Curated annotation (Swiss-Prot):
One of its GO terms (biological process) is peptidoglycan biosynthetic process. The keyword Cell inner membrane applies. This is UDP-N-acetylglucosamine--N-acetylmuramyl-(pentapeptide) pyrophosphoryl-undecaprenol N-acetylglucosamine transferase. It catalyses: di-trans,octa-cis-undecaprenyl diphospho-N-acetyl-alpha-D-muramoyl-L-alanyl-D-glutamyl-meso-2,6-diaminopimeloyl-D-alanyl-D-alanine + UDP-N-acetyl-alpha-D-glucosamine = di-trans,octa-cis-undecaprenyl diphospho-[N-acetyl-alpha-D-glucosaminyl-(1->4)]-N-acetyl-alpha-D-muramoyl-L-alanyl-D-glutamyl-meso-2,6-diaminopimeloyl-D-alanyl-D-alanine + UDP + H(+). The keyword Cell wall biogenesis/degradation applies. UDP-N-acetyl-alpha-D-glucosamine binds at T11, G12, G13, N120, R161, S188, Q286. It comes from Prochlorococcus marinus (strain NATL1A). Its EC number is 2.4.1.227. Keywords: Cell cycle, Cell division, Cell inner membrane, Cell membrane, Cell shape, Cell wall biogenesis/degradation, Glycosyltransferase, Membrane, Peptidoglycan synthesis, Transferase. It holds the Pfam family Glyco_transf_28. GO terms for molecular function: UDP-N-acetyl-D-glucosamine:N-acetylmuramoyl-L-alanyl-D-glutamyl-meso-2,6-diaminopimelyl-D-alanyl-D-alanine-diphosphoundecaprenol 4-beta-N-acetylglucosaminlytransferase activity; undecaprenyldiphospho-muramoylpentapeptide beta-N-acetylglucosaminyltransferase activity. Pathway: Cell wall biogenesis; peptidoglycan biosynthesis. Coiled coil: none annotated.
């Protein structure tokens, strides 16, 4: 049985695509997972994948701290190289982040092929520096190839949970009716500024007969103890929902940040969207992620602004009062973002 090592650690943006890909594989593959102690993967990675934890960090701080971290990186790379030989790993799949660096270097020492997946339109630091040492780099957004001229790249899309791939009925708590269904995804960090923009236009949306599901994120406490402000039958406010596949499959419009995870979920579910990039994202990658969807007419970009301005209100009103939503839906349907897992597996098969 061939053995695949998956190296994914730290944030959901690194872990969830790797989990989705792992779950798509048949039982003919044995999977070993390489992570970091006390990080999110300890909670998320199921027991059926053998999770091995390795202490590693980024190159941060002053020159002396960076030299110390560099020594730790080289030591970790040697550890990975030994591990790969001990576990008789055939091929590696990694999604970037701190754990990827020693994994890529260790694989180079051991002569084991590596497929690196990059979800964002602007590759992360590890991808830019070490992508050239990988046998292939799979891209979630095709424009990322512009930054990886020395790498062998292919556009595959980013894996999502299988639940996003099939039609699903709406949860019972979503307002019933014929009105346009708008799903607002505030993000796990709260997206407080974006939520403020959306709250300002809620009266307009309700007046136009829209049904609104506002997922604020756990850090936005505006609605707590303000039940009178979320009591309209066509408005549902929640911190989060684990039924995102059903919500996006049935939504007429999403209002969202433009992280890589949100982009791939919107693409797979063919959901037209208004994207509000987080202005402080690393390298402004959310702006370029959003530009990918806007380029073929699947999304409209609205920069974060003072809620008192009417920019978001005017754009939403225009969408609701015209055929633009229908045209955006057609554009989404005509854009191929299907079967990322299958495309990634084909690359893994070709390099292993």
């Amino acid at each position: 049985m061939p053995r695949l090592l998956i190296a994914a650690s730290g944030t959901g943006g690194h872990i969830y695509p790797a989990l989705s890909f792992a779950d798509s594989l048949s039982n003919s593959w044995e999977i070993v997972w390489l992570g970091v102690p006390n990080r999110l993967e300890v909670e998320l990675v199921p027991e059926k994948y053998n999770l091995i934890k390795l202490k590693v960090g980024g190159l941060q701080g002053n020159i002396f701290r960076k030299l110390f971290d560099l020594c730790k990186l080289l030591f970790a790379s040697v550890q990975v190289s030994v591990l790969l030989r001990q576990k008789k790993i055939n091929v590696i799949f990694t999604t970037g982040g701190y754990i990827s660096a020693p994994c890529i270097l260790g694989a180079k020492m051991a002569g084991i092929p590596v497929l690196l997946h990059e979800s964002n339109a602007i590759p992360g630091k590890v991808t830019r520096l070490l992508g050239r040492f990988c046998d292939h780099v799979a891209l979630g957004i095709p424009s990322a190839s512009e930054y990886l001229q020395r790498c062998r790249t292919s556009f595959t899309g980013t894996p999502v949970r299988t639940e996003f791939l099939f039609e699903k009925s709406l949860p019972s708590w979503v307002p019933l009716g014929e009105g346009v269904l708008i799903v607002v995804m505030g993000g796990s960090q709260g997206a407080i500024k974006m939520n403020e923009m959306v709250r300002k236009i809620l009266p307009c949306l309700i007046e136009k007969g829209c049904r609104v599901v506002h997922l604020t994120g756990k850090n936005d406490c505006f609605y707590r103890n303000r039940d009178q402000e979320k009591s309209h039958p066509n408005l549902v406010v929640r911190d989060f929902s684990d039924e995102m596949p059903a919500l996006l499959r049935n939504a007429d419009l999403a209002i969202s940040r433009s992280g890589a995870g949100a982009i791939c979920e919107l693409m797979v579910t063919k959901t037209p969207s208004i994207l509000i990039p987080f202005p402080s994202s690393t390298d402004q990658h959310q702006e370029l992620n959003a530009a990918y969807m806007a380029r073929f007419g699947g999304a409209i970009i609205v920069n974060q602004h003072d809620p008192e301005k009417n920019i978001l209100k005017n754009i939403v009103s225009n969408l609701l009062d015209s055929n633009s939503l229908r045209e955006m839906k057609l554009n989404m349907n005509n854009h191929d973002y299907s079967y990322p897992e299958k495309k990634i597996f084909e690359i893994i098969h070709s390099i292993s």
